Amino acid sequence: MMNHTPLLLGIRERLIFALDVPSRTQALEWIDQLGDAISFYKIGMELLASGEYFQVLDDLASRGKRVFVDLKFFDIPATVAGVIRRLSQWPISYCTIHGWHAPMMQAATEANTSNMHLLAVTVLTSMTREDLAKMGINREPVDVVVERALAAHMAGMSGVIASGQEAAAIRRAVGSGFSIVCPGIRTNHVPHNDQQRTIGIKAAFANGADAIVVGRPIRMAQDPQAAAEAMQTEIMTALTEPST
């Protein structure tokens, strides 16, 4: 079942916390610590390796949190379709698939039998133009991102994962009714680490982002809950103040 309609998000669901931890114990500590400051959690590969991934998924759902399964599936269409078919049984809001192969995305959307929204990973925010060139792609990241966003849209995906730097170009190319979720968010005085194509919160939403994914700027903060609440306030301001 294609689920092209974007996920309708409450204003406090637009901040997604990257729960990049190695165990269920640490995951629960973060969920408890952040409390009402975070309503949407991304769970990825590190937690999968713990063997406790689906327990954490249930933990989040039982607390009324939205879940973003970020495992970036990339395989032959039949295999990816099988995974999506099984994941459709779980309370998942977002799930990622690499946006490199249109038939794979098409198979995934056709296999989706739930309200899970599929997002195509365009170009990782850790990659630069030079990284793409080393892979034989001699193009600007924004051009590759827009091309993959258009392919995802045609395949019936709900949206994409992309840097906020490219969100405006995606929105111009695809229009409304298509989710743009942006990682690589960095605030003042927070190191970029391995992120390259970064952007601030206000700029990401001004460019057309629907939601942002934040990990280290919250985890590394002296008071993570206060940092998350400050980001929620910044998001609310970005979404409600008149555009100039």
Curated annotation (Swiss-Prot):
Sites where the protein binds substrate: 20, 42, 70-79, 125, 186, 195, 215-216
Catalytic activities: orotidine 5'-phosphate + H(+) = UMP + CO2
Active site as annotated: 72 (proton donor)
Enzyme nomenclature, EC number: 4.1.1.23
Family the entry assigns: Belongs to the OMP decarboxylase family. Type 1 subfamily.
Role noted for this protein: Catalyzes the decarboxylation of orotidine 5'-monophosphate (OMP) to uridine 5'-monophosphate (UMP).
Quaternary structure (record): Homodimer.
Name the UniProt record assigns to this protein: Orotidine 5'-phosphate decarboxylase
Organism per entry: Xylella fastidiosa (strain M12)
Lineage, top ranks: Bacteria, Pseudomonadati, Pseudomonadota, Gammaproteobacteria, Lysobacterales
